Amino acid sequence: VAIEQLEQYAPEVIDSFKELSKTGSVEFLAEPYAHSLASVFDVNEFERQVKMHADKLEQLFGKRPTSFFNTELIYSDEIGEIVSKMGFKAMLIDEAKHVMGWKSPNYVYKHAYVSKLKLLVRNHKLSDDFAFRFADLSLTAEKFISWIAGLPAEENVVNIAMGYEVLGV
């Protein structure tokens, strides 16, 4: 589990996260503790792991998460309903072209029948560009920022998400 590895082998990273948390501009998202597929196979185990992770984040950073990130961004309306019942206000989901069609990921959406759950859609293209093209220097910060600045004005939410492995963790 990444958070346990950071605590044991890189406590300075946890300390830097604590400093980020103090700014009030960052929220750490809850997820299944073991990065498991429990949301698909075992609701009770899923809820147990999510609570365990939310408890750990609250213990470390002094704030209980209100947003959720499922393993590999797995989503269904049923999973969203469970997440909402657990008290989360928002869930980060992947941009599924076969579902979204022409819709942009750069808006806040809502659950199909639990309207209080906000759905934040990962911008697949920008996330992958950041994750895979910065490291080999084929993408510069200036170019990346220009892409975001070039989005239509009404598309004012851009969610970039990637795993810790991108950062070498």
Q: Model-found features: residue ranges?
A:
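Short, conserved catalytic/metal-binding motifs centered on acidic residues
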Residues: 68-71, 160
